[in-house]
């Protein structure tokens, strides 16, 4: 039986988000391929346990609230349980709004297969391509 991991990093004003319709245009100049490429970059950093590199990609106000140590403490155990990266399984990107501010954003859900299980990364970006949310489920 597959274990279901649910890990939420609640970051300041990003308490959550509401996914928009998948057919809705992405905000600003954001492009689906660019978002997916950046998600792959982030997931590779997570897999390499380069948590400072991940934190550096967050929006400035969120960097003040998140440390590489805290991110590592949250992610090391799930990563240990999942084993080695195998492949990306699914990728989707949708327009969304930040709950607390109603600002435009984009959210990507990337399904990833590991040697001991699978997990979905939910990564959200503001219109400047700064990370504003990182969730594993």
Predicted features and spans:
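Internal amphipathic alpha-helical segments of the cytochrome P450 catalytic fold
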Residues: 18, 51-52, 131
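Short, low-complexity N-terminal intrinsically disordered segments enriched in polar/charged residues
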Residues: 21-48
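Short solvent-exposed beta->alpha transition segments
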Residues: 52-105
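Exposed beta-sheet edge and beta->alpha loop/turn motif
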Residues: 92-137
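Short hydrophobic/aromatic segments of transmembrane alpha-helices and their interfaces
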Residues: 36, 54, 113-115
